């Protein structure tokens, strides 16, 4: 049996909960509880209330999600630019 595809969504962190969990409101208005992915935890990426994030949702349980990316305001897509000397 093949694995089901994950649903990718964008949302806004409303509240920081204990045990590295977050209350997130998706762009479509749906609210859920999300946790940080292992790579974000490993690299000590901090998530605060008000951050824009990308999430993965399972099609079986839409009340829980995994945060996979934190969008930084003012930085567009693409590789980081090195300052010129």
Curated annotation (Swiss-Prot):
- InterPro entries, per database record: NA-bd_OB-fold (IPR012340), RNA-binding_domain_S1_IF1 (IPR006196), TIF_IF1 (IPR004368)
Where does this protein have coiled-coil stretches?
A: none
* Compartments where found: Cytoplasm
Per UniProt, the keywords (alphabetical) are: Cytoplasm, Initiation factor, Protein biosynthesis, RNA-binding, rRNA-binding
Q: Where is the S1-like domain?
A: 1-72
State the Gene Ontology terms under molecular function: ribosome binding; rRNA binding; translation initiation factor activity
A single GO cellular-component term from the record reads: cytosol
Pfam families membership: eIF-1a
Question: Origin, by domain of life?
Answer: Bacteria
| Coarse class of the protein's main subcellular location | cytoplasm
Summarize the subunit comment: Component of the 30S ribosomal translation pre-initiation complex which assembles on the 30S ribosome in the order IF-2 and IF-3, IF-1 and N-formylmethionyl-tRNA(fMet); mRNA recruitment can occur at any time during PIC assembly.
Summary of the function given for this chain in its UniProt record? One of the essential components for the initiation of protein synthesis. Stabilizes the binding of IF-2 and IF-3 on the 30S subunit to which N-formylmethionyl-tRNA(fMet) subsequently binds. Helps modulate mRNA selection, yielding the 30S pre-initiation complex (PIC). Upon addition of the 50S ribosomal subunit IF-1, IF-2 and IF-3 are released leaving the mature 70S translation initiation complex.
Q: Which PANTHER family match?
A: TRANSLATION INITIATION FACTOR IF-1, CHLOROPLASTIC
- Family listed: Belongs to the IF-1 family.
Protein name as annotated: Translation initiation factor IF-1 2
Q: Which organism is it from?
A: Polaromonas sp. (strain JS666 / ATCC BAA-500)
């Amino acid at each position: 049996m093949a694995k089901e595809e994950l649903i990718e969504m964008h949302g806004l962190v409303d509240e920081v909960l204990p045990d590295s969990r977050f209350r997130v409101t998706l762009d479509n208005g749906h609210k859920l509880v999300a946790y940080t992915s292992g790579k974000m935890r490993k690299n000590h990426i901090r998530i605060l209330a008000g951050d824009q994030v990308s999430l993965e949702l399972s099609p079986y349980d839409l009340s829980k999600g995994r945060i996979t990316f934190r969008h930084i305001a003012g930085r567009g897509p693409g590789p980081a630019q090195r300052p010129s000397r």
